Regions:
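ABC ATP-binding cassette signature C-motif
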Residues: 1-44
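Glycine-rich phosphate-binding loops of nucleotide-dependent enzymes
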Residues: 45-346
Length: 346
C-alpha cells in the first residue's frame, strides 16, 4: 500500500488479481516496480497504447513529477500530443534512420508529423455527408454477462445502415468488447436478437456469421487479427483458404495465395512488399494494413456473391499506430461507407 499509494491505488486494489486490472492500473504497477529501485533513467516504450484518455492524463502528470524530482525519462511514442505535453526535446526516427532532434516548444505538431511520416499529413478527414440506406445490422434487446457473470449488456438495441459509420463510444470495460465478441460469434449472449441483412445470427458460429456479411478488424491484431508466425500471404486468406481458388483436396495453392497477397500488398501499401515475410516482422501500422486489406477484399468478394451490403466492425482500429497509418485507416473506413457498406466503429 505504501508503494502504490502515490499511484492512485486504493487499499482494496492491492489484493486484485493482475488479470483483472485495467491497462492503466497495469502501467502504474510497472512504474511502481521500477521506481522502487530508484533509477536515474526510465525508458517508457509506448506506455499509453492501451490507456483511456483519463489514464493518459494521469500518466503524463506522473512523468512530469518524475522529471521534477530529477529523473531522466525517455518516452518512445508516436502520439504528438504526448510529445507536446511532457517532452523537452524530441528525436525523430523514420525507417531506422535518424531524422532530427528538435526543441518541442518550438516545433508544431504538423512539423513533427511531417518528419515522422516523410510527407505532409492531413489531420482532417475529407469526407462527404453520409447517405444512409437500408438497415443491414439490427440488434434488439441484447443481454449478456461478462467473464465474472456480471450483466454487461442490458437490453441493448441499435441499428447500422448501409452507407453509414455508427460509432460506439465509452471507456474500456463497459460492454464494447463483449458486444463485438457476440457479433462475431466468439461469445454467447443470454437473450435478444441480431440480424444481418435480415438473417438471424445470434449465437451462430463465427464462420457462418462471416459468410452472412460481418467482417471484423479486431481490437487486438496480434491475438485475433493475425497468426504472427504465418507469412503475409497466408494471413490474407485466413477465412478463405478452403475455397477452391486457394486449395484443392486439402492442398494449398500457394501460387494463387501469393498472387492474391501481392494485390493486397500493392493496393494497401504494405511494407515490406515481400509477402513471404512473417507477419511478426511487420510494424504495427503494416500489420493493420494487412488486416484491413484482407477484410476489405473479403467484403468485395462476398458483396459480389450476394449482391448485399456488408458490415465492417472496426474496434480501436488506430490503437498503437503512427499518424500516417491513422490517416490511412480513416480513409479506408470512409471508403467502405461510400461504397455502400455499413461500418460499426468501436
Amino acid at each position: 500500500r505504501k508503494n502504490l499509494g502515490s499511484f492512485m491505488f486504493n487499499g482494496e486494489d492491492v489484493f486484485k488479481k493482475i488479470n483483472v486490472l485495467s491497462g492503466g492500473e497495469k502501467v502504474r504497477l510497472e512504474l511502481c516496480k521500477i521506481l522502487k529501485k530508484n533509477p536515474n533513467l526510465l525508458i517508457l516504450d509506448e506506455p499509453t497504447a492501451v490507456l483511456t484518455p483519463q489514464e493518459i492524463n494521469e500518466l503524463m502528470q506522473i512523468i512530469r513529477n518524475l522529471t521534477k524530482e530529477g529523473k531522466s525519462v525517455i518516452i518512445i511514442t508516436h502520439k504528438l500530443k504526448e510529445i507536446k505535453a511532457v517532452a523537452d526535446n524530441c528525436t525523430i526516427i523514420r525507417r531506422g534512420k535518424y531524422i532530427d532532434t528538435v526543441l518541442v516548444e518550438k516545433t508544431t505538431e504538423d512539423d513533427l508529423a511531417s518528419m515522422m511520416v516523410g510527407r505532409e499529413v492531413n489531420f482532417k478527414v475529407d469526407k462527404e455527408d453520409a447517405k444512409p440506406k437500408e438497415t443491414i445490422l439490427e440488434i434488439k434487446n441484447l443481454n449478456a454477462r461478462d467473464t465474472r457473470n456480471v450483466q454487461i449488456l442490458n437490453n441493448l438495441s441499435l441499428e447500422v445502415k448501409a452507407g453509414e459509420i455508427l460509432g460506439i463510444a465509452g471507456i474500456d470495460g463497459n460492454g464494447q468488447s463483449e458486444l463485438v465478441e457476440i457479433l462475431t460469434g466468439l461469445k454467447k449472449a443470454d437473450s435478444g436478437s441480431i440480424t444481418i441483412n435480415g438473417n438471424e445470427i445470434l449465437n451462430d458460429k463465427p464462420l457462418n456469421i462471416f459468410n452472412k456479411g460481418i467482417k471484423n478488424i479486431p481490437e487486438d491484431r496480434h491475438k485475433r487479427g493475425l497468426v504472427l508466425d504465418f507469412t503475409i500471404a497466408e494471413n490474407t486468406v485466413l477465412q478463405r483458404y478452403k475455397e477452391p481458388t486457394f486449395s484443392k483436396n486439402g492442398v494449398l495453392n500457394n501460387e494463387a495465395i501469393e498472387k492474391h497477397a501481392k494485390s493486397i500488398v500493392e493496393e494497401f501499401d504494405v511494407r515490406p512488399t515481400d509477402y513471404t515475410v512473417k507477419s511478426r516482422a511487420l510494424s504495427g501500422g503494416n500489420q493493420q494494413k494487412v488486416i484491413i486489406g484482407r477484410e476489405v477484399d473479403n467484403i468485395r468478394v462476398d458483396k459480389a456473391k450476394t449482391n448485399q451490403p456488408q458490415l465492417l466492425i472496426a474496434t480501436q482500429p488506430t490503437r498503437g499506430l503512427d499518424v500516417g497509418a491513422i490517416e490511412f485507416v480513416h480513409k479506408a473506413l470512409i471508403e467502405q461507407r461510400d461504397e455502400g457498406n455499413g461500418v460499426l466503429l468501436v
